[in-house]
A protein has these predicted regions:
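Cytosolic juxtamembrane amphipathic/interface segments immediately preceding
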Residues: 3-21, 166-174
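N-terminal signal-anchor transmembrane alpha helix
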Residues: 14-47
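Interfacial/capping segments of alpha-helical transmembrane domains
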Residues: 36-58, 204, 208
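Perimembrane loop-to-helix junctions flanking transmembrane segments
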Residues: 48-70, 212-213
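Interfacial helix-start motif at the membrane-water boundary
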Residues: 59-88
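Terminal transmembrane helical module of multi-pass membrane proteins
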Residues: 148-214
């Protein structure tokens, strides 16, 4: 009974704020597209220089000279947790709203640029390499970032209404409690994504590189 009630509340919440969630998704996709455009706007020299460093990285992976899995996990978890934490903090500040949107756009840009560069330099091989090295962890990370950004925007808008519209009667505290719980859940999911990035993706990447003779 409680589970069904929570599901109904969640569905009602998403319907109520569907326009914000849609805007956040579109903004992220715009970042991805812009990242791919940036790749196409690079000069041949810039692409060659960047691909040289990428080739060095490929060689390190094949030779097993990359960081230990535990170190990769710590780096990934710290990086993504900082990003999520920053978005969460910006959500409780009135002036943080535009920064949240900028950060999400940048995240999309990075993903679009990374995939776009691999495809532009290696074609189908680059796509397959991106599929095994970037996609697995981002199947968790991207939805978490999008959800956290949307909830931060919603909470920030509530703060603005509470501050500037005295007729706004909804209490902030219940929303803030849920906001904290959402952040905790996001961190748990980020830890799972970091585990995939540290222990699964490197093996998949090395296997794919051996298969593709990179």
């Amino acid at each position: 009974m409680k589970k069904r009630l929570y599901q109904n509340d969640a569905a009602s919440y998403f319907r109520e704020h569907s326009s914000i969630f849609l805007f956040i998704v579109i903004l992220f996709l715009m970042g991805v597209i812009f990242g791919a455009i940036v790749v196409n706007s690079m000069s041949i020299t810039q692409k060659e220089d960047l691909f040289y460093y990428l080739s060095q990285f490929f060689g390190q992976i094949l030779n097993g000279k990359v960081a230990e899995n535990n170190d990769l996990f710590a780096q990934s978890f710290l990086h993504n947790s900082k990003f999520i934490g920053l978005i969460w903090i910006l959500g409780i500040s009135i002036i943080g709203l535009p920064v949240i949107l900028i950060l999400l756009f940048i995240k999309g840009l990075v993903v679009g640029f990374t995939v776009g560069f691999l495809v532009s330099q290696l074609g189908l091989k680059g796509f397959l390499l991106a599929f095994v090295s970037i996609l697995p962890q981002n199947l968790i990370i991207i939805p978490v970032f999008i959800l956290m950004a949307a909830l931060s925007v919603i909470f920030s808008l509530r703060m603005i209404k509470k501050q500037f519209f005295k007729t706004y009667g909804q209490p902030i505290l219940p929303f803030f409690k849920n906001y904290i719980l959402t952040f905790v859940a996001a961190v748990v999911l980020i830890s799972a994504a970091s585990g995939v990035e540290a222990y699964v993706s490197p093996w998949l990447m090395k296997t794919m590189m051996g298969t593709l003779n990179l």
